[in-house]
Design a protein with these regions (language model features):
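Terminal substrate-recognition subdomain of acyl/acetyltransferases
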Residues: 141-156
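Conserved catalytic-core motifs of GNAT/GCN5-like acyltransferases
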Residues: 108-111, 123, 128-143
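Short glycine/proline-centered loop/turn elements that form peptide/ligand docking sites
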Residues: 88, 92, 114-118, 135-140
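Conserved GNAT acetyl-CoA-binding A-motif
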Residues: 92, 99-110
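Acetyl-CoA-dependent GNAT
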Residues: 9, 21-81, 92-93, 153-155
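Short amphipathic alpha-helix that is part of the acyltransferase structural core
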Residues: 1-24
Length: 156
């Protein structure tokens, strides 16, 4: 998993971390995955191409408090070599379907404002842009990027 995170984090600036920040110990990674497995509604799907991990998409409960139980955050990453295959769309469709089955009625995500490809996909899947956080990300070169907050409601 660390290797996958390092690779995807280095392929584009659209990830929230740099490759050198993906250095979880095996124990920490296992603990993180176990916590997700133990949570009754949070989950992650992985995509493999010829036995190689090329994508993952997951949903995490934002809170277990009653007033926020309906909300989940979504994260996704796809290796560049698998871009354009429809994998992101497929993973997100499956994750959104499962999120609804798990009782979530609202799924939220944040995306780099200059990531037009991702924003297009999210809008195509029914997400709506709700706001923008200026200078949410500071890159190593000293420049900043805004973050667009998006939401999809899963109610019938």
């Amino acid at each position: 998993l660390n290797e996958y995170l390092r690779l995807t984090s280095g392929e584009t600036h659209y990830m929230v971390r740099y490759p050198e920040e993906c250095d979880q110990t095996l124990e920490a990674a296992q603990k993180r995955l176990q916590a997700m497995e133990d949570h009754e509604r949070s989950f992650m799907l992985a995509a493999f191409l010829d036995g190689e991990l090329v994508g993952n998409c997951g949903v995490n409960a934002m809170s277990d408090h009653f007033k926020m139980r309906h909300r989940a955050s979504l994260g996704i990453s796809i290796k560049k070599k698998a871009w354009g295959l429809g994998l992101g769309k497929l993973l997100m469709e499956k994750v959104l379907e499962q999120a609804k089955e798990n009782g979530f009625t609202q799924v939220e995500l944040g995306v780099f404002a200059d990531n037009d490809r991702a924003r297009h996909l999210y809008r195509k899947l029914g997400f709506t842009e709700m706001g923008c956080i200026p200078k949410a990300f500071c890159l190593k070169d000293g420049t900043y990027r805004d973050e667009v907050q998006m939401v999809k409601f899963l109610m019938d």
